Structures are given as C-alpha cells and as structure tokens.
C-alpha cells in the first residue's frame, strides 16, 4: 500500500472579524436568496457561469472522486427542447403522479406545469451525478457529494447577484438524452440562472424559515 502524501494546510481564510460576525454577514446575503420563476433575459457572461461553477467544484466529495458534471445551456433551441420535455413530465406529475397531499402542499407556491423560465433565463445549469468515473472507476457517496456541490453553486450564484431555481422534473432522463451525456451520468438538478425580472414576485409561503431553536440542538440527551 502506498503511503499517502501530505502538504501543509496553508494560511487559513481570515474574515478579519470574529467567526459569529462573519457568519452573520454571510447569512445576510444568503437570507435574501429566493427561488425565482420569473427571469429577465438580461445577458449573463459566460465568465460568471464559469466562476460560479468553479465555486461549486470546491465541495468535498467521497474519496475526492468529485462525481459531478455541470452542463451549461444557453442555446435557445436547446432550451426550448428542454422546456418541452420538462413540461411533458410535469403534466404527468400534476395529472397522475403526485399524491393529493403533495398537490395540496404545492398550492401555496402557485406552481404548475408551465415552465416558461426554462426559455427566458439566459442559462440553464444541468447538474449531473456520476455513478462511475469516466474511466469506469467507482464513486462514493455521490448523492451527498453532488448535493453539497449544488448547494455551493446556489450560494455562489447568490453572492454573484444572480437568481436561481432548483427544478427537478421527474423523471429526468430526457436531460441526458438531449445533452448527449453517457450512461454513468444521471441528471440531478436543473437550475435556471440569471437576473430576476423587474416585476418578479415570489410566494409569501416560500419566504418563511423555521426558527433556529427548532432546527439546532446542543448536546441533546436521550
């Protein structure tokens, strides 16, 4: 067995203020993020997409296999094809697949099977989870790893002043087909990326967050 090699950590990031203060400042940015369904067609440069995805790729992953692939789509014809396929699946969802409880939970959000934003947003970022490496090797904890990377992508987009939406049409096999992806890449999430429309609105129901004392426990006893 080959002994692992190590290097010095390097100079840790110093926010220049106490940890709680730095975290609160970051929270102030993230807390303004909204899932946007009304986008402007205002151009977003390719360099911005590259920088945002580069942030996502800093996520930790099982055995550092980095089991993700990000496909950026701006071509109008391809976006139109993705919208048509996504809406087909969504019609099935709302008409047959979703339970009554699910549909009732969606009512306050005002969602439906019309996904105009898939054509209006300047970019669609399709996140793929790799079930194997490109050379046929194993990946580990790929769901968790890609989930972490996706969250970091959303945070980076917010830091860049751009809006996003996490869209998961089910099933998503059509994305691999339309984008020519190999069998070991599974569509994980479809993320429109861009500026919000000037008259963009968001559902009140989506703004509230559980209080910290409900989601954070310190040293709980059985």
Task: Locate each region found by the language model.
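Glycine-rich, charged/polar anion/phosphate-binding loops
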Residues: 54-57, 108-112, 175-177, 200-201
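Small-aliphatic-rich amphipathic alpha-helix that forms the alpha element of a beta-alpha
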Residues: 52-56, 125, 130-178
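Glycine/small-residue-rich phosphate/adenosyl-binding loop
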Residues: 2, 66-146
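Short alpha-helical scaffolding segments that buttress acidic/His motifs in well-ordered protein cores
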Residues: 30, 52-56, 191
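A glycine-rich helix N-cap at a beta->alpha junction
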Residues: 90-98, 180-205
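Glycine-rich phosphate/pyrophosphate-binding beta-alpha loops
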Residues: 57-64
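N-terminal accessory segments that position/regulate proteins before the catalytic core
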Residues: 1-36, 40-50
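C-terminal helix-cap and adjacent tail motif
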Residues: 2-9, 13-22, 112, 189-222
């Amino acid at each position: 067995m080959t002994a692992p090699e190590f290097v010095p950590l390097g100079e840790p990031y110093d926010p220049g203020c106490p940890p709680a203060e730095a975290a609160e400042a970051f929270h102030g940015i993230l807390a303004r993020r909204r899932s946007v369904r009304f986008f402007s067609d205002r151009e977003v440069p390719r360099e911005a997409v590259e920088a945002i995805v580069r942030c996502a790729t800093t996520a930790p992953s099982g055995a550092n296999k980095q089991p993700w692939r990000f496909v950026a789509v701006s071509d109008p014809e391809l976006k139109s094809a993705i919208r048509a396929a996504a809406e087909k699946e969504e019609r099935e969802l709302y008409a047959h697949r979703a339970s009554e409880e699910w549909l009732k939970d969606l009512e306050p959000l005002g969602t439906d099977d019309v996904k105009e934003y898939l054509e209006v947003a300047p970019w669609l970022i399709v996140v793929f989870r790799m079930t194997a490496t490109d050379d046929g090797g194993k990946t580990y904890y790929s769901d968790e790893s890609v989930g972490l990377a996706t969250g970091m992508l959303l945070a980076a987009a917010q830091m860049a002043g751009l809006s996003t939406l996490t869209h998961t049409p089910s099933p998503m096999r059509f994305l691999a087909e339309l984008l020519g992806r190999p069998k070991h890449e599974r569509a994980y999430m479809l993320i429109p990326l861009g500026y919000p429309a000037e008259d963009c609105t968001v559902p009140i129901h989506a703004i509230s967050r559980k209080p910290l004392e409900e989601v954070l426990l310190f040293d709980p006893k059985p």
